[in-house]
């Protein structure tokens, strides 16, 4: 049977499972491009400091050309110290950029599944398939085009300074070095910016490719639903959501109530009664604690009478359901309250 077409976007559950396996949309181009670009900017910013350290390294090496073998230890210490001073800022910058670029792409994730042993990784046939896959072909073509593009841009930027460098022997050494550093900086930063733009395009493509890869068929959606239907966590989440919706609907009915009976703050029952339509008062809302307080608050906002009847409230609460009529045994007590409420309304409007 032919594989069913995957036309549906991945569900949150599928995305979470795929993420746990270490499969996320990412582009290594972004990290490498940012490292190169920011390292260049750091070199420009700390150029004087780095140049001084490089000169010290050079002097340290040349100063010990004719040194005695007993002085080589001191040479090593000086050389190592200066190298560390030069490379430490670049190392920490590169580390920070790599971490932040990956966090920006797919957030924090820790999983050992990509490191787990899989037979297909050592299967030579699978290796050959990966080598001749469309993904490998795309990466090869992309990197080749990227290399040609960057070379073309470098040639274009350097072309303007070509004449100066060819005739540099006629200029002072300081001016030649200054021009060389300036031209190199402009060229490298331009290449870094272009490489970063290419990296963002690569990430957009990888994101599209990832979304396409994790798409689901209708059959997979049905199977996932059946699988999750009995999952305790999902069931509790669904029940909580249903309770929240029921509570919202119930609170929306409170403004339609005729009276609210309370105990006085622990229990609240909102009753609606229309003599022309209802055979008996209907419970539109009920609740304890904070829900009871909310019912009373809404009732007061809509000028609905709130009557304190602790014994009746305690008796009504377990015996009635929202949306149902009260039982006959409460008719007399509730009728007296509603009659009193209606009498007060008539007296107000009289």
UniProtKB/Swiss-Prot annotation:
Transmembrane stretches, start-end: 30-50, 90-110, 147-167, 185-205
GO terms in the biological process aspect are: bacterial-type flagellum assembly; protein secretion
The answer, when asked if Cell cycle is one of the entry's keywords, is no
What the entry lists under Pfam families is as follows:
Bac_export_2 (PF01312)
Q: Which InterPro entries match?
A: FlhB, T3SS_substrate_exporter, T3SS_substrate_exporter_C
Compartments annotated for it: namely: Cell inner membrane
Gene3D superfamilies to which the protein is assigned, alphabetical:
6.10.250.2080, secretion proteins EscU (3.40.1690.10)
For this UniProt record, the keywords arranged alphabetically read as follows: Bacterial flagellum biogenesis, Bacterial flagellum protein export, Cell inner membrane, Cell membrane, Membrane, Protein transport, Transmembrane, Transmembrane helix, Transport
**Membrane topology of this protein:** Multi-pass membrane protein
Task: Give the record's GO CC terms.
Answer: plasma membrane
Q: Which family does it belong to?
A: Belongs to the type III secretion exporter family.
What job does this protein perform? Answer: Required for formation of the rod structure in the basal body of the flagellar apparatus. Together with FliI and FliH, may constitute the export apparatus of flagellin.
* NCBIfam families per record: flhB (TIGR00328)
Name of the featured protein: Flagellar biosynthetic protein FlhB
**Which gene is annotated as encoding this protein in its UniProt record?**
flhB
């Amino acid at each position: 049977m032919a594989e069913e077409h995957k036309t549906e976007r991945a569900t949150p559950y599928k995305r979470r499972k795929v993420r746990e396996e270490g499969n996320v949309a990412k582009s290594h181009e972004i990290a490498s491009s940012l490292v190169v670009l920011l390292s260049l900017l750091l070199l420009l910013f700390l150029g004087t400091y780095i140049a001084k350290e490089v000169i010290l390294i050079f002097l340290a090496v040349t100063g010990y050309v004719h040194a005695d073998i007993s002085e080589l230890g001191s040479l090593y210490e000086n050389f190592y110290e200066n190298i560390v001073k030069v490379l430490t800022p670049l190392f920490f910058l590169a580390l920070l950029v790599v971490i932040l670029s990956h966090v920006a792409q797919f957030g924090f994730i820790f999983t050992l599944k990509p490191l787990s042993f899989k037979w297909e990784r050592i299967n030579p046939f699978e290796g050959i398939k990966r080598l001749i896959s469309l993904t490998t072909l795309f990466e090869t073509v992309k990197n080749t085009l990227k290399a040609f593009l960057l070379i073309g841009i470098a040639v274009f930027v350097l072309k303007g300074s070509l004449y100066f460098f060819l005739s540099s022997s006629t200029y002072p050494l300081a001016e030649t070095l200054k021009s060389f550093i300036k031209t190199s900086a402009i060229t490298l930063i331009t290449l870094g910016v272009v490489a970063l733009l290419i990296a963002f395009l690569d990430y957009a493509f990888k994101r599209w490719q990832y979304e396409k890869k994790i798409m689901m068929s209708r059959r997979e959606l049905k199977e996932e639903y059946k699988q999750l239907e009995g999952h305790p966590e999902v069931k509790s989440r669904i029940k909580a959501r249903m309770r929240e919706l029921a509570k919202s609907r119930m609170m929306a009915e409170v403004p339609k109530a005729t009276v609210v009976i309370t105990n006085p703050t622990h229990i609240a029952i909102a009753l609606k009664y229309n003599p022309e339509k209802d055979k008996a008062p209907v419970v539109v809302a009920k609740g304890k604690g904070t829900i009871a307080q909310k019912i009373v608050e809404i009732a007061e906002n809509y000028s609905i009478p709130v009557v304190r009847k602790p014994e009746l409230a305690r008796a009504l609460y377990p015996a009635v359901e929202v949306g149902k009529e009260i039982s006959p045994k409460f008719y007399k007590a509730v009728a007296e309250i509603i009659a009193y409420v209606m009498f007060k309304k008539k007296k107000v409007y009289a």
